[in-house]
Amino acid sequence: MLQGRREAKKSYALFSSTFFFFFICFLSSSSAELTDKGVNFEVVALIGIKSSLTDPHGVLMNWDDTAVDPCSWNMITCSDGFVIRLEAPSQNLSGTLSSSIGNLTNLQTVLLQNNYITGNIPHEIGKLMKLKTLDLSTNNFTGQIPFTLSYSKNLQYLRVNNNSLTGTIPSSLANMTQLTFLDLSYNNLSGPVPRSLAKTFNVMGNSQICPTGTEKDCNGTQPKPMSITLNSSQNKSSDGGTKNRKIAVVFGVSLTCVCLLIIGFGFLLWWRRRHNKQVLFFDINEQNKEEMCLGNLRRFNFKELQSATSNFSSKNLVGKGGFGNVYKGCLHDGSIIAVKRLKDINNGGGEVQFQTELEMISLAVHRNLLRLYGFCTTSSERLLVYPYMSNGSVASRLKAKPVLDWGTRKRIALGAGRGLLYLHEQCDPKIIHRDVKAANILLDDYFEAVVGDFGLAKLLDHEESHVTTAVRGTVGHIAPEYLSTGQSSEKTDVFGFGILLLELITGLRALEFGKAANQRGAILDWVKKLQQEKKLEQIVDKDLKSNYDRIEVEEMVQVALLCTQYLPIHRPKMSEVVRMLEGDGLVEKWEASSQRAETNRSYSKPNEFSSSERYSDLTDDSSVLVQAMELSGPR
């Protein structure tokens, strides 16, 4: 009996000590990401980044220093509770990049391009051992390229072009075996160019670099601008002299010709840079692999997407459009995706052209743009993979319950406007959407507007000339000049955005405007008439009841009518549209447009339908336009 009690005590003691040991281990592991005050290290690091930046649009507003978990913050993506992506491109951020970024040791992607960030690139970035993509291009960074970047052994994609970096290119970059894309162009770099293992290596626009790649050759030589691909081994210099003068002359003439060719090629690249804004260097030697990376894109295996969507089951069909059907899918790691199965793939160009266009689309990264996650191509299929937007599209939400409140509709309008502004004026190369409508504006988990389907029109039309003649769009949203001539421009998108604003205000689809018994005429006629008669309450979505600001509705209607003027030259640019939605410059624009319409009417003879009256959208020409749209049928 006594012996049994002793054994029981021993067992209890052993159990207690074991439990205590594992409890201590648990506390140790759970506190690995916490400071001694119980604060998440990643929160501290991100707040450090926020405090060193100036954020004019408040995109980092929900970065809260009292939070325990940063995974719900804007611009942040997490996996297994750790921050793996920091993406805030084209947000007008200024200030400096804090060294605390080095404490985000699980980061895989950093996208801060197209901002106004100054100062040095922090050396602490070299602590990010899991980093694969780093894009700091088109900022105002100064100082030298940190040699510590070479410590990030997994880095595959590095862009620091279009800054004001100085000094030499670190020779340690030559040791980065995973690096496939390196763009150092348009800085103030000097000295020799080290041999790089990157398949695509751009150093164009650095006037003080040396073309031969050795320090010795930099002394006493005139530096030359250059843009090169450094995959082949450098030619070994010959130790022996020429045998006779004839060989020397031939060699000299040949060398001169080669130099002239190099200079001509450099001038051609410079000219393309000036006219196209970007020269894409693209390599697709591994296109036959089942899975690979293309810049920031992942190439999926077709069977993987087939499995994720249950063989593209109709149960997973979440959308249909002019470019193809969209299916909801679930990958093996639990990620929810949206797979767009493109139509008309035989009308486009070849595989290389298709993937080049995809690369260009993937470079368009903005808070209000749907990020392209990956793609899949076979001999008969082309599929695009996107993150899944759980709240659907604006078109579907306008018909759903609970009703979208007025504040959310305003935020959607501004977000969609900023996305289009980026495509038109900040993206490189610029992109015309060509099918702006409520169904192509998606909503994320926080009901922020995300513009989708951008770039797809060009993706399927790249065999045609730069002036597209095939009209791609949706009836009711197509600008008159695009419908009649097939020529699209940024102003084509502005017209579609104006219709989108009216859809947000009324809760109706474009072709539903003005179809009620007491609303004869088409959308713009109906809206203008009620606006002139100060009867805007008849325009507003009945589901909103009286829960809206009348002045704000009137202002948004005015912006919509300015966007939908008949002549493209009279429509504002998207940068002007965004400013007007933010409350700046609307009064002046509206008065100028009204005066122009009044002038047009004063020059028209009575009972004569003049061209000036016909083509001013503040006159009664809209019904003709919509009739033409309806007759054109779906495309």
Swiss-Prot record:
Coiled-coil positions: none
PROSITE patterns, alphabetized: PROTEIN_KINASE_ATP (PS00107), PROTEIN_KINASE_DOM (PS50011), PROTEIN_KINASE_ST (PS00108)
Membrane topology note: Single-pass type I membrane protein
One cellular-component annotation, GO: plasma membrane
Entry EC number(s): 2.7.11.1
Chief place where the protein resides: membrane
Record-linked InterPro entries: Kinase-like_dom_sf, Leu-rich_rpt, LRR_dom_sf, LRR_N_plant-typ, Prot_kinase_dom, Protein_kinase_ATP_BS, Ser/Thr_kinase_AS
Record keyword Cell membrane present: yes
Active site: D435
Post-translational modification (record): Autophosphorylated.
Residue list for modification Phosphothreonine: T309, T408, T468, T469, T474, T485, T564
PANTHER family: SOMATIC EMBRYOGENESIS RECEPTOR KINASE 1
Protein name listed in UniProt: Protein NSP-INTERACTING KINASE 2
Native source species: Arabidopsis thaliana
Organism lineage: Eukaryota, Viridiplantae, Streptophyta, Embryophyta, Tracheophyta
